[in-house]
Amino acid sequence: MEKSNDHDKASHGGSGGGATEKWEETSPGIRTAETMLRLAPVGLCVAALVVMLKDSETNEFGSISYSNLTAFRYLVHANGICAGYSLLSAAIAAMPRSSSTMPRVWTFFCLDQLLTYLVLAAGAVSAEVLYLAYNGDSAITWSDACSSYGGFCHRATASVIITFFVVCFYILLSLISSYKLFTRFDPPSIVDSDKTLEVAVFGS
């Protein structure tokens, strides 16, 4: 009886991962779609980075540049890292699925999550700085800056908006990499100790 149960476990284990790999290998359109989805943020990241790098203004009140604000410098670095990773991951995603090993799937999952939070944080802190620049803070007697540096604020706003579009792409990529990872594992099972039968919680 125990040998029979062990055989059932062996035949049941890994079935999810095998089905996922077979589905990926027989669907070249899926690989193409993922590659294009990973390439899409490259242009957006570069656009957000370039707009912010060129963001400076000089008038009778003085000069201001993105480099004067830590949040904007972080935004530039985050978009640069994101552009490089997007290009590299797209090249790897375009490779045949025969190399789609568990370490590779885990790597994509972890890095996609990391980049999502990295870019989201960059957009969030920059948006907060822009809010203060547009509205000021009367509680601590901060006056708004955008009334004096309108062009600077408009370019910074454009860069932040583009960054949030990048976040949307990376949320989608994170969902895809999560699906590809966790569908490789079989659902948990409940063992009936009285009948020594193994019953899948999510029975196929």
Curated annotation (Swiss-Prot):
The keyword ATP-binding appears for this protein: no
Keywords: Cell membrane, Glycoprotein, Membrane, Transmembrane, Transmembrane helix
Protein's recorded name: CASP-like protein 2A1
Transmembrane segments: 33-53, 75-95, 114-134, 156-176
Residue numbers on the Cytoplasmic membrane side: 1-32, 96-113, 177-204
Membrane topology value: Multi-pass membrane protein
Compartment(s) of residence: Cell membrane
GO CC annotations on file: plasma membrane
Residue positions with a glycan: N68
Comp. bias (Basic and acidic residues): 1-11
Subunit-level organization: Homodimer and heterodimers.
Superkingdom of origin: Eukaryota
Organism: Arabidopsis lyrata subsp. lyrata
Major subcellular location class: membrane
Classification via Pfam families: CASP_dom
PANTHER family, alphabetized: CASP-LIKE PROTEIN 2A1, CASP-LIKE PROTEIN 4A4
Residue ranges of coiled coil: none
InterPro entries: CASP/CASPL, CASP_dom
Renumbered residue ranges of the record's region Disordered: 1-25
Extracellular-facing ranges: 54-74, 135-155
